[in-house]
From Swiss-Prot:
This is Large ribosomal subunit protein bL28. Belongs to the bacterial ribosomal protein bL28 family. GO terms for cellular component: ribonucleoprotein complex; ribosome. GO terms for molecular function: structural constituent of ribosome. It comes from Gloeobacter violaceus (strain ATCC 29082 / PCC 7421).
């Protein structure tokens, strides 16, 4: 799987690490991704998704199906058996 949030699409950002002498080296700022098991009310089962911590906080305010619909995600593929 790619290092990308399934609901928000967050992924790594290209950045520089800058030393005191201002020498710059390219590096990646990785998104804080976590595998989460979330209860799906409509299907009555758990769904396992790779989410950013921002998406986990957003799930407290919005429904899982609303976010999945925006992302074009079919939750039936990620059902935990």
């Amino acid at each position: 799987m790619s290092r990308k949030c399934m609901l928000t699409g967050k992924k790594a950002n290209n950045a520089y690490s800058v030393s005191f002498s201002h020498r710059r080296n390219k590096r990646l700022q990785m998104a804080n991704l976590q595998w989460k098991r979330i209860w799906d009310d409509q299907q009555g089962c758990f769904v396992r998704l790779k989410l950013s911590t921002k998406a986990i906080k957003t799930l407290e305010h919005r429904s899982l199906h609303a976010l999945a619909k925006e992302a074009g995600l079919d939750l039936s593929k990620y059902v935990v058996k």
